[in-house]
Design a protein with these regions (language model features):
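Membrane-proximal structural modules of membrane-associated proteins and complexes
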Residues: 1-126
Length: 126
């Protein structure tokens, strides 16, 4: 819940909302994990996928991206964090440095926990 997407420029200034390709050095995604009364306190993998306008997941193994299996199919993730879920509406923050300009168009962000989608957001690059 409370998903926000920021672009971060070369000086570290964060701006929420749509942006121009040359303005973004990095993408920052912040959100809170919802409370889940039936979930035990335990470690979980939280992944994000940044999906480009062509429908491809933005990933770079050298920058911490990777893959996982769902129903026998390989899926890619942009970034991952291992957390201890403690039912306290934890705030998580992911920062992804693409290393090149983002293509113009509409992007989608999928937030995944233990291979299930738990949230979505979007942003546009002009």
């Amino acid at each position: 819940e409370n998903i926000k997407v920021f672009n971060v420029n070369s000086r570290g200034k964060e701006r929420e909302g749509d942006f121009r390709s040359r303005q973004a050095e990095k993408i920052k995604v912040t959100f809170n994990l919802s409370e889940n009364a039936v979930a035990p306190v335990a470690g979980h993998k939280i992944m994000i996928q940044i999906v480009d306008p062509a429908g491809n997941v933005v990933f770079d193994i050298a920058r911490g991206s990777g893959s996982f299996q769902v129903d026998g199919r390989e899926q890619f993730f942009t970034s991952v964090q291992e957390i201890l879920f403690d039912n306290s509406k934890q705030e998580l923050s992911f920062v992804y440095d693409k290393g090149s300009e983002f293509d113009e168009g509409d992007y989608k962000i999928n937030i995944i926990s233990d291979f299930y989608e738990i949230g979505q957001a979007s942003f546009s690059v002009r």
